[in-house]
Amino acid sequence: MAAKIIDGKTIARQVRSEVAARVRQRLADGKRAPGLAVIMVGDDPASRIYVGSKQRACEEVGFLSRSYALPDSTDEAQLLALIDTLNADAAIDGILVQLPLPAGIDNSRVLERIHPDKDVDGFHPYNLGRLCQRTPKLRPCTPRGIITLLERCGIETQGMDAVMVGASNIVGRPMALELLLAGCTTTITHSRTRNLQQHVERADLIVAAVGKPGFIPGEWVKPGAVVIDVGINRLESGKVVGDVDFTGAAQRASWITPVPGGVGPMTVATLMQNTLQACEAFHDD
């Protein structure tokens, strides 16, 4: 059997269109547009690309967008001071600090300085704690985007055996919480997991986020399983591939996300959703 493709580009476009429609309605009602501030420290090329995509998405949906490109020489105190200013800015509903940060700046201290109601990346301990308690507010963008993909494709997750391959703070751990919330029996695997193949082979739903091209062979995929590939890996040839052997897995899975064009577009679309949510839930008068 050949898997159905989960078209992240199309679904992300739908999500952005829904956000844009809501913004237009807000403006028609005499309310302000939501505002997003993006902070980048240094000149990392990949970060520049990501920040650019977020700015374009803001323009598309009608948000107020502010970008702060700080030099490598910026110290932690200066960055925290900017966050404090944005926390107090009534026009800004979401604050995003682009990672990675230069050496000498404490990621945790910076992310925890963002007010939880403006934490549109969903990384603040308060928001992660809410997700853990099954009462989420602002949810991490990539995991929330994956849940949206599953919902929009009509994939019923209740009772599924789900295996999360990767345990990062950005994807793996919050994704496992999202899968629990979606009714899955959830296993998290990581670099010290023994018999990874056995875990993957029994999974009804596989989410892979390890950053290693072709890490999950196609033959490990149980016939009929759903495969969500978060990996974005550029080969020496320039080709971009995921963490799962797509060709092999697509012959066995029922649904699969391509790379590129699967999970990636949903991360930015979900950021737009989170910013709108922050505006309407926490900052409207």
Curated annotation (Swiss-Prot):
Q: Which domain of life is it from?
A: Bacteria
Keyword flag Chloroplast:
no
The processes (GO biological process) annotated in the record are: L-histidine biosynthetic process; methionine biosynthetic process; purine nucleotide biosynthetic process; tetrahydrofolate interconversion
Keywords associated with the record = Amino-acid biosynthesis, Histidine biosynthesis, Hydrolase, Methionine biosynthesis, Multifunctional enzyme, NADP, One-carbon metabolism, Oxidoreductase, Purine biosynthesis
Reported EC number(s) for this entry are 1.5.1.5, 3.5.4.9
Pathways involved: One-carbon metabolism; tetrahydrofolate interconversion
Listed under catalytic activity are: (6R)-5,10-methylene-5,6,7,8-tetrahydrofolate + NADP(+) = (6R)-5,10-methenyltetrahydrofolate + NADPH; (6R)-5,10-methenyltetrahydrofolate + H2O = (6R)-10-formyltetrahydrofolate + H(+)
Spell out the InterPro entries in the cross-references.
Aminoacid_DH-like_N_sf, NAD(P)-bd_dom_sf, THF_DH/CycHdrlase, THF_DH/CycHdrlase_cat_dom, THF_DH/CycHdrlase_CS, THF_DH/CycHdrlase_NAD-bd_dom
In terms of CDD domains, this protein maps to: NAD_bind_m-THF_DH_Cyclohyd (cd01080)
Q: Any idea which positions bind NADP(+)?
A: 166-168, 191, 232
Its GO CC terms are: cytosol
Q: What GO molecular functions are on record for this protein? A: methenyltetrahydrofolate cyclohydrolase activity; methylenetetrahydrofolate dehydrogenase (NADP+) activity
Q: Hydrolase: present as a keyword of the record? A: yes
HAMAP family linked to this entry: THF_DHG_CYH (MF_01576)
Q: Per its database record, what is this protein's job?
A: Catalyzes the oxidation of 5,10-methylenetetrahydrofolate to 5,10-methenyltetrahydrofolate and then the hydrolysis of 5,10-methenyltetrahydrofolate to 10-formyltetrahydrofolate.
Task: Identify its protein family.
Answer: Belongs to the tetrahydrofolate dehydrogenase/cyclohydrolase family.
Summary of subunit composition and partner proteins:
Homodimer.
Q: Which PANTHER family match?
A: C-1-TETRAHYDROFOLATE SYNTHASE, CYTOPLASMIC (PTHR48099:SF5), C-1-TETRAHYDROFOLATE SYNTHASE, CYTOPLASMIC-RELATED (PTHR48099)
The name this protein carries in UniProt is Bifunctional protein FolD
Organism lineage string: Bacteria, Pseudomonadati, Pseudomonadota, Gammaproteobacteria, Enterobacterales
